[in-house]
Amino acid sequence: MKLIDRRMRLTELLLRCSISVFALLALILVVTDTEVKLIFTIKKTAKYTDMKAVVFLVVANGIAAVYSLLQSVRCVVGTMKGRVLFSKPLAWAFFSGDQAMAYLNVAAIAATAESGVIAREGEEDLQWMRVCNMYGKFCNQMAIGVSSALLASIAMVFVSCISAFSLFRLYGATRDRRTTPW
């Protein structure tokens, strides 16, 4: 295996492992986040299931963590055997999976960020109050969880780029370079 291939595999492996860690951390932080307030003798509990965008984030991060863990195992096995991906159909499958994971998680982050801004700032035109004024601990832990999910999403975008490079270099290697005018 060439040095550049080894470095690419190592980078991909580190990114995939970080995706698994950050996505799992986000999942744990968000799912375990609750806060109870007593409002006029009525107990009100804030939990992640109250906002559907956050439920979407939890599901997306769960899928991403498992997918990245499985792909990490594939990277380790490929590195140990010293093989680089040469199959175009398999490269397309990995590329498509990586793209789907990246888009899914970026969409989940965007939806959750919008819900978070509304919870923090409220919406005066619709008379929605600021929820984070009442549930400060809940909002702070949720923000940390969403930040972890954002880091996982950024790593997914980079993995997607590596996957695209791995796929499209399979097509560039078969061209006869002597016939190009450049």
Curated annotation (Swiss-Prot):
Membrane topology designation: Multi-pass membrane protein
Top-level taxon in the UniProt lineage: Eukaryota
InterPro entries: CASP/CASPL, CASP_dom
Localization annotation: Cell membrane
Cytoplasmic topological intervals: 1-12, 74-89, 163-182
Family that this chain belongs to: Belongs to the Casparian strip membrane proteins (CASP) family.
Protein name from the UniProt record: CASP-like protein 2B1
Segments crossing the lipid bilayer: 13-31, 53-73, 90-110, 142-162
Main location: membrane
Subunit and interaction comment: Homodimer and heterodimers.
Record key words, sorted: Cell membrane, Membrane, Transmembrane, Transmembrane helix
Extracellular side: 32-52, 111-141
Cellular component, GO annotation: plasma membrane
